[in-house]
Regions:
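Membrane-interfacial amphipathic/re-entrant helices at transmembrane-helix boundaries
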Residues: 1-21
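Transmembrane helix-bundle core of multi-pass membrane transporters
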Residues: 6-11, 82, 90-150
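Hydrophobic alpha-helical transmembrane segments
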Residues: 13-18, 61-66, 91-92, 131-136, ...
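Alpha-helical transmembrane segments in multi-pass membrane proteins
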Residues: 15-24, 45, 49, 53, ...
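Short loop segments and helix-boundary regions at transmembrane helix junctions
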Residues: 28-111, 207-219, 236-239, 263-264
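Helix-loop-helix "hairpin" substructures at the membrane interface of multi-pass membrane proteins
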Residues: 130-202
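Transmembrane alpha-helical segments in multi-pass inner-membrane proteins
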Residues: 190, 194-245
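Cytosolic-side transmembrane-helix boundaries in multi-pass membrane proteins
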Residues: 241-248, 252-269
Length: 269
């Protein structure tokens, strides 16, 4: 029986496609704006929301999304309004979120069977509700970028100049921070907290081997991310390993191969 006939694998493939679109768009902004460290902080801070959700018996993904968005706003507010150093603000919310998640996880009576899937990802845990959430986030991200594309590009490459042109820089930055948090949390079932940030950076690194145009990077990142996910999911199924690790391993192998091919082409050109 082909693995494509299994419902859980079909869900994983659809989830991978949606995640590739959302991460391809948001990841390009993150890399262009050099927000990788902030995104990593938000990713790990979201564990606080998972712990709270498990403890109070609510959907951990939804509570993680709320917690991640609030953490993103907190980092932005501390660094811009309170003038706390950005790396210090990130470290504060990163460590606080992880500590809250660990405390509530240990305070929850009984065993927490979903914990490894939240940390490392699992194709078996991607359900219909996760697909609906991913769909909603992907549509929202795509709509925002379609409506605010020129403004986002201006902010991504020169926020100071964008502000001098009376563009709503701060409002758009808060909106994009919220979208980053939502995108990260919506992919947790697939790649896990530990590796989620890689979905937002490695496809963009690979796309950068061939183009530097913002729109082209988005397009290539979506395709590359989709291929990475396909290979990773197949590897995860065959080797019975966490899908997150398999996807990121495949992504890095693809990046290294393409980098080597490009280097050889230029060498013998």
């Amino acid at each position: 029986m082909s693995i494509f006939q299994y419902t859980f694998f079909q869900n994983a493939l659809l989830g991978a496609l949606l995640a590739s679109v959302a991460c391809g768009i948001m990841g390009t902004y993150i890399v262009s704006r050099r927000l990788v460290f902030i995104s990593g902080g938000i990713t790990h801070a979201s564990f606080g929301g998972i712990g709270i959700g498990v403890f109070f018996g609510i959907n951990p993904i939804m509570s993680a999304m709320v917690y991640a968005v609030l953490s993103a706003f907190g980092v932005e507010w501390l660094s811009t309004k309170v003038k706390v150093r950005e790396d210090s603000a990130i470290a504060l919310f990163w460590t606080f979120g992880m500590s809250v998640g660990i405390l509530f996880s240990f305070l929850t009576p009984g065993f927490m069977p979903d914990l490894p899937s939240f940390l490392f990802g699992s194709i078996l845990t991607i359900g219909t509700s996760d697909l609906w959430l991913l769909s909603a986030v992907t549509v929202l991200v795509a709509l925002v970028f379609l409506l605010l594309y020129r403004t986002i590009i201006s902010i991504a490459f020169d926020a100071t100049f964008a502000q001098s042109q009376r563009l709503p820089v701060h409002a758009v930055e808060y909106l994009l921070m919220a979208l980053i948090a939502m995108t990260i949390v919506s992919t947790l079932r697939m790649v896990g907290i530990v590796l989620a940030i890689s979905m937002l950076t490695i496809p963009q690194m690979t796309a950068n081997l061939f183009t530097y145009r913002f729109g082209h990077i988005i397009f290539l990142s979506i395709i590359i991310g989709w291929v990475n996910c396909l290979m990773g999911l197949m590897l995860s199924y065959w080797l019975n390993v966490p899908s997150g690790a398999a996807i990121i391993f495949s992504a890095i192998i693809i990046y290294m191969l393409l980098w080597a091919i490009k280097s050889l082409v230029f060498k013998f050109k």
